[in-house]
């Protein structure tokens, strides 16, 4: 059975993602024509997708079922990524150094975690606006993913970066984010994209849990867009932060 048909069991809110992933991906790698190849530049084998790129239905299934390990690059994209990793090695740069210096133009000292520990189980309090994700425009930067997965030409992959660390759900065994954090991200994307004419049918997003993160010290989410005009995305990136969350947004989602 086509795994993508399972997508009908998931809603657009992406709040019903399971906490863990399947133990074995062999059947998915076979179905999606993915092979594993080891490189001395990578700690784990690289996943190479042969044949056609992931379709939009494939992307929806992978993200909404939270089986993010399935994503892979084409061979050409993998070669390009390995060349980049070699360049980092030759220049004695970490991926974090590169992102801060060449892409985000942030100082490492600007990265921070929430400063106030709340007595309750709540992760956020409007009493401490500096600890609210996607609230302070200066905390946010939107960039194209320089090394996207193997998607169709009408699909764009952007990353939304945050100086403020997006908290991990303390009850998650795999380092996933909480339902409240997912609601906040949904609201931010609704204001940034949907309110400007982009349908939810054109948007999916995910945040890698800890075991999948190649960049751990700089929090970010991945947003995948289908059939969205280049000009819209370029203007969004040049604008910097998107439509940030207000204190009222936080109140309404509590």
Curated annotation (Swiss-Prot):
Pfam families recorded: DUF3605 (PF12239)
Record note on disruption phenotype: Leads to increased resistance to the chitin synthase inhibitor nikkomycin Z.
InterPro entries, A to Z: DUF3605
Record's subcellular location: Cytoplasm
Keywords assigned: Cytoplasm
GO cellular component: cytoplasm
Induction: Expression is induced by N-acetylglucosamine (GlcNAc).
Predominant location: cytoplasm
GO BP of this protein: N-acetylglucosamine metabolic process
SS bonds (residue pairs): none
Function: N-acetylglucosamine-induced protein which plays a role in the N-acetylglucosamine metabolic pathway.
Protein name: N-acetylglucosamine-induced protein 1
Lineage, opening ranks: Eukaryota, Fungi, Dikarya, Ascomycota, Saccharomycotina
